[in-house]
Amino acid sequence: MRTWAEWDDAVPGFVEIDLVGHEGGNSRGEFCFTLDVTDIATGWTETRSVRNKAQKWVFAAIKDATAAFPFAILGIDSDNGSEFINRELLTWCEQENLTFTRSRSGNKNDGAHVEQKNWHIVRQTVGYHRYDTAAELDLLNRIWALQRLLTNHFGPQQKLLAKVRTGAKISKTYDRPATPFQRVLADTGTVSRDVKKRLRRENKPLNPAAIQRQIQALSAELLTLTTAKQGTKPQPAIRAKPNDSTKQPQRAS
């Protein structure tokens, strides 16, 4: 794959991308997926949900998400799924002079940054339910429009600076916690002053508690929709307590 810029995790603009499936334990039929796009240097993350993982939906979501970053995207790293490894995305990366790399087959640590966001943002916010309707898709994206504000402006993160093994013990050193917003403002070589001014204006009126309440309200609405599809489920059998059973256990003589 064409390399337009040397991959540099310390520079804003190099992102990892990944999909999270919302099959709810049932992989049959069509269901929604959520795309996470995470900048390695700053932790800035944009999230978009799509109706399924067809290339055209995923590609459109990638373009929309990367356009929302407060700095230019320089490189994209994905796993080996066909929703990412295809001619359309590669051609676009070449046209935009984006370095496009993919993880090594069988190496689960290559996408560690974005996979952490899959759990912290997607699973902790909307859980493991099955989402497969247009109404649910709309709610998911309304949630992400709010969640991005919490994650990027108010979610402090720590970055690993060093890892030292001494015998069986591993010692890790982290930097001071900082939000993606703060890391973008601290950048001295990539992000322009105008962008930083715009981000400060965007940040000033934000109320994280109010945003969280809005997310909770939308999440409750989403849960109502998905549970309504399931109908009334039989209650699981409850094992009788020893004193409630019809025949008391006896000790063998």
Annotate each predicted stretch with a short phrase:
Residues 15, 57-60, 84-88, 117, ...:
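Generic recognition of stable, solvent-exposed alpha-helical segments in well-folded globular domains
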Residues 78-80, 84-93, 100-126, 137-144, ...:
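RNase H-like two-metal-ion nuclease catalytic core shared by retroviral integrases
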Residues 1-36, 44:
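Mobile-element integrase/transposase regions
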Residues 18, 37, 43, 62, ...:
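Mobile genetic element proteins and their domesticated derivatives, centered on retroelements
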Residues 30, 38, 47-70:
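Active-site beta-loop-alpha junctions of metal-dependent nucleic acid enzymes
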Residues 143, 174-184, 194-253:
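Protein C-terminal end segments and domain termini
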Residues 145-182:
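Charged, gly/pro-enriched flexible loop segments at helix/strand junctions
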Residues 125-140, 158-166, 183, 201:
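Short, solvent-exposed helix-loop connector elements
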